């Protein structure tokens, strides 16, 4: 049966399944006692878009992703969670069910999953790796026997999640199925970052997989991977260049008229940039009604 929307305006996505899977199986990181992982609403929106499917071709709409937010927003837990999802969950499109909704199958039914958490230094990989390992302390260990988390690798029932900090030359040909490229504003020509990014993307696309970058603000003119990705996404959106699949460019900063010297203006700018994670008592400024206050202390950012 072909795609059949259940309501007007609905688009096909495996994102609803992914969100349910994350909440059911993953633990919230950085807490003393187990709590289920619960993404913020804007994180949910990113996942729904990331797993959106073209109803005519069955391909994912987006071939690459870029999730840009300020430090502390929560990029690392959400991307660490997606590493686990891509390693274990049913995220390879496998047709439509009897109701015309998309269904998936795990990578392990197609090929051996190989997920990479990549950066240009060991410390940078830990930004995503450490919360990811904590998320594996939840029910996922009982549901998927054979998952074994270690300092630099997570063994899977079939496949692995690995850290990757080596040069572009040494990753050539790795059968990657999904990769997170962490802090790509630091991936510059002098440390081999662009070469590493190119090799990882090439390896991943050859296997039908995808990559997501998680940059902080980049410095224009540095030639970083983050800068180049932003330029490519903008050019494609404006019709100045053609790419096989669009880049999901989800990036938000404070409004350009934010006055850094005026407290109220600065607080309002931080509420915009931090979105749902802002702990402002008025809740978030993105949604109506607003989401409840999040975890980021805005006063500490001033």
Task: Name every feature range the model reports, one short phrase each.
Residues 1-302:
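Phosphate/NTP-binding elements of NTP-utilizing enzymes
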């Amino acid at each position: 049966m072909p795609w059949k929307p259940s309501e007007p305006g609905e688009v096909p996505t495996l994102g609803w399944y992914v969100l349910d899977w994350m909440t059911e199986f993953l633990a919230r990181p950085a807490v003393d006692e187990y709590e289920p992982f619960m993404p913020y609403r804007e994180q949910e929106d990113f996942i729904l878009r990331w797993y959106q499917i073209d109803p005519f071709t069955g391909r994912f709409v987006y071939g690459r992703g870029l999730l840009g937010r300020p430090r502390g927003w929560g990029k690392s837990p959400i991307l660490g969670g997606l590493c686990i999802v891509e390693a274990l969950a049913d995220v390879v499109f496998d047709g439509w069910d009897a109701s015309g909704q998309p269904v998936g199958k795990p990578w392990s039914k197609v090929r051996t999953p190989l997920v990479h958490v990549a950066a240009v230094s060991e410390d940078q990989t830990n930004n995503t790796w450490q919360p990811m390992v904590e998320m594996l302390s939840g029910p996922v260990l009982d549901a998927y026997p054979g998952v074994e988390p270690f300092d630099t690798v997570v063994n899977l029932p079939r496949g692995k999640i690995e850290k990757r900090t080596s040069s572009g030359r040494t990753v050539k040909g790795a059968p990657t199925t999904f990769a997170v490229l962490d802090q790509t504003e630091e991936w510059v020509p002098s440390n081999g970052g662009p070469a590493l990014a190119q090799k990882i993307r090439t390896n991943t696309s050859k296997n039908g997989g995808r990559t997501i970058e998680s940059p902080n603000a980049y410095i224009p003119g540095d030639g970083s991977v983050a800068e180049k990705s932003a330029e490519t996404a903008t050019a494609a959106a404006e019709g100045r260049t053609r790419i096989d699949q669009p880049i999901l460019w989800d990036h938000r900063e404070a409004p350009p008229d934010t006055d850094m010297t005026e407290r109220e203006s600065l607080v309002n700018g931080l509420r915009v940039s931090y979105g749902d994670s802002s702990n402002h008592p008025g809740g978030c400024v993105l949604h109506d009604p607003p989401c409840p206050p999040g975890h980021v202390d805005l006063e500490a950012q001033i």
